[in-house]
């Protein structure tokens, strides 16, 4: 998953946002937004509706948070965390559609769309499947080649993004457990989600300061991350984000969106 590297002095903190839908409220967006630097906003397929999308874009603008599109498979009931059989052509069209939908709200609100990060099962599939990864990367590039693509380091999605001429931002997960091969543990696996703020913050600091995480086997695995994700539906997300920021500040690391100096 990449060579071990030295400490970085700046890191992006991203979170999946705007995933409420109709009367169903998911996440604590108003409390989370001041603590992050990039927001991955749901585009209506796994979560989010037009009102939620507009409201979340406005909330990001209010707090100076960079906005990204968070597209995925068409699976509202499964919250897009279930694998869905789709052809690369279907994935291309669905991703392009969703980017366009969020971009419309960004344009109306005077907010720049900065990046794209696939959600859930699409993210995991694109990380390993070159054809699906290529479809995602082409959709992003065909919409706007200046958009950044968030991807796991060393993944098929990273390679597809680079091949499409995109700037790829390597992503690590502060609140998820890792396997020895550098991939995320399945959510059904013990230790897949780090519930304790102290553990998540320690993992975040390790990725930023040494470029490594401790896998479930106890091995140190290289995860060279430029952005760290904390899931918005994590039950302790506020405490996790505050602890991460405190740990990074103590280590002399600043937080900021990619390209924002």
Swiss-Prot record:
Give the EC number: 3.5.2.9
The cross-references to Pfam families, in alphabetical order and at most eight, read: LamB_YcsF
What protein am I looking at? Answer: 5-oxoprolinase subunit A
UniProt keyword Hydrolase present:
yes
Q: Which UniProt keywords apply?
A: ATP-binding, Hydrolase, Nucleotide-binding
InterPro entries in the record: Glyco_hydro/deAcase_b/a-brl, LamB/YcsF/PxpA-like
Q: Which GO terms describe its biological process?
A: carbohydrate metabolic process
**Which PANTHER family does the UniProt record give?**
5-OXOPROLINASE SUBUNIT A (PTHR30292:SF0), UNCHARACTERIZED PROTEIN YBGL-RELATED (PTHR30292)
Organism, per UniProt?
Symbiobacterium thermophilum (strain DSM 24528 / JCM 14929 / IAM 14863 / T)
Under catalytic activity, the entry for this protein gives: 5-oxo-L-proline + ATP + 2 H2O = L-glutamate + ADP + phosphate + H(+)
